[in-house]
């Protein structure tokens, strides 16, 4: 293969139906406004089913009762999931109280779901409540524009409460990047906010009239923490600081985890290093990467349309050279950086600004009032007295940030009263994560969020049995191969295959810089636990000092590392 130009810059052939849908949508309007008034169905029909995703929503239904409703000759119980745009995950207590009330009053489930893309989702919004939801967000100074479909999604930023000045600078860049890459269409304001329709023609100078070939994800990362999982993202700006001040970014392009079962033309891929840029070129480089992918990405096959496949097709150097040409900027050599972990620092930490920051562990990011643990109410009670801000993390947790010394005891008392602080939560539970999956996700093949808590309890038992109760394995479960749970960057990753069955992947690492290989296909939870027990037993006896589980299974020859995922991800290279 010739790296310089291994494949065509543009894939010719019949465009996918998604491209037709976008081109006929009148800049994302479709007939959504008319569909809103159709009371004969609880859902959106035709192209609108997909177009609403550009407006931050997915049409879902309760899969637990789908068969029952079909027997009764009823349509599925349609409801929307709405995802807020929240670059860097920062939200004020006043905004939080607004979304807390809406979730209680206007959703079927009454919960707020913190996601691993640093925002929140409402699940179960009936069609009649969709417009009020967007209007509420607008009143709070928020929106849901471009949190789904073929656009640049919510921009992540490392949740680093300690280095407060550096975090603030990085966060400001996350916001700027998000705003710069937003769709320019007035469709969102017209449909949801009753903005006046103007006669001017819409233009999309960056995204183009048919937007991007596929979803596009961006992060701003502050080493040594890789909490945002940069290798799951298309475009990454890794902060480079000098004396605590941000001076530029290392740029990495082309990460992504989504695959399709049985299709070896799909694979996860780590992001490639392009080089270093000073701060002043950040937006130019972001735009150039996006427009290159816009023009070169595969619009004939959505399964092969993401940036990672474009890089493999045209070659990293060819793509990089085009970005430099479009931006009028040359990359310098990558500056040194390293990652030491991805987990959140649960509990109190003191920042360099002398303020305190409390990271609350929220299992699977689901804030709801449970018997004896009124989590959602607890966060609302804290919001009523907190003078700083809240930060949603890429690990689905919540940081109460900027707490002065005088308020610390009162906030901790509220957190403990409502079950938001629990000294008995293990390191293993804190380092486990799942996507939503059943009952609301239409793509779910196996349980994830509802499956994980009890599964972790059994893994905790295995660790304790082998004398490793204080240890942890980065464990992730994703309900389908689209990979929202980021299982393909875990030490142990479970990818849903069918109800009660998963593909088991081993050999990622704690830092999130290695993709795990499939060890067993289509097996049950009991089979996974049996394998885990055997391997943890070996890890306990044979590991080196501070050696993580993922590093151990590679060194011990249990499984071979994925070196070049485009070529070796599907190789069966099991050693013992």
Swiss-Prot record:
Keywords: 4Fe-4S, Amino-acid biosynthesis, Cysteine biosynthesis, Heme, Iron, Iron-sulfur, Metal-binding, NADP, Oxidoreductase. It catalyses: hydrogen sulfide + 3 NADP(+) + 3 H2O = sulfite + 3 NADPH + 4 H(+). Its EC number is 1.8.1.2. Siroheme binds at residue 484. The keyword Iron-sulfur applies. The lineage of its organism: Bacteria, Pseudomonadati, Pseudomonadota, Gammaproteobacteria, Enterobacterales. Disulfide bonds: none annotated. One of its GO terms (molecular function) is metal ion binding. GO terms for biological process: cysteine biosynthetic process; hydrogen sulfide biosynthetic process; sulfate assimilation. Binds 1 siroheme per subunit. InterPro entries: CysI, NiRdtase/SiRdtase_haem-b_fer, Nit/Sulf_reduc_fer-like_dom_sf, NO2/SO3_Rdtase_4Fe4S_dom, NO2/SO3_Rdtase_4Fe4S_prot, NO2/SO3_Rdtase_4Fe4S_sf, NO2/SO3_Rdtase_FeS/sirohaem_BS. This is Sulfite reductase [NADPH] hemoprotein beta-component. Belongs to the nitrite and sulfite reductase 4Fe-4S domain family. Alpha(8)-beta(8). The alpha component is a flavoprotein, the beta component is a hemoprotein.
